[in-house]
Amino acid sequence: MADKAASGVLTKLPQKQIQEMKEAFSMIDVDRDGFVSKEDIKAISEQLGRAPDDKELTAMLKEAPGPLNFTMFLSIFSDKLSGTDSEETIRNAFAMFDEQETKKLNIEYIKDLLENMGDNFNKDEMRMTFKEAPVEGGKFDYVKFTAMIKGSGEEEA
């Protein structure tokens, strides 16, 4: 039953949103095994400046009826993407790679991460993801990008 619900999400979500979720999943899947584990969530949370305890981590993963692969991740978190703070969450995921706090990342670095982490993006997926992305001078503006994919039209947080 969970598999049916999870696969149904793929037909309901816009392709852009699925691509963004794939990118988020890849960033969270720290050990690159195709599944988000308690250790992955702990590592990403610590990088974002928050250290949840084991009880919190267990509660986060409890929503999944089994191992949290990409399809299950989509099923559980896609509803949260339409909420008011989802854009902030996406920006924060990008921001963890933005050591200079410029709100821009080297596009080649982002592409390298997506090609070599978790759900390795192929060339077509990469082209689709960045087709209309705000890139200027080799810098990817993740604030504009998240506003664009979320449809908020806002360029600043």
UniProtKB/Swiss-Prot annotation:
Pfam families: EF-hand_7
Amino-acid positions noted as binding Ca(2+) in the UniProt annotation, renumbered to this chain: 29, 31, 33, 40
Record Gene3D superfamilies: EF-hand
Entry keyword set: Calcium, Metal-binding, Motor protein, Muscle protein, Myosin, Repeat
Domain annotation EF-hand: ranges: 16-51, 85-120
Chain ranges passing through the membrane: none
Organism domain of life: Eukaryota
Metal-binding found in the keyword field: yes
A Gene Ontology molecular function term of the record: calcium ion binding
SMART domains cross-referenced by the UniProt entry: EFh
Keyword Translocase on entry: no
Cellular component aspect of the GO annotation: myosin complex
Role played: In molluscan muscle, calcium regulation is associated with myosin rather than with actin. Muscle myosin contains two types of light chains: the catalytic light chain, essential for ATPase activity, and the regulatory light chain, a calcium-binding protein responsible for Ca(2+) dependent binding and Ca(2+) dependent Mg-ATPase activity.
Note: This chain binds calcium.
Protein name listed in UniProt: Myosin regulatory light chain, striated adductor muscle
Species, as recorded: Argopecten irradians
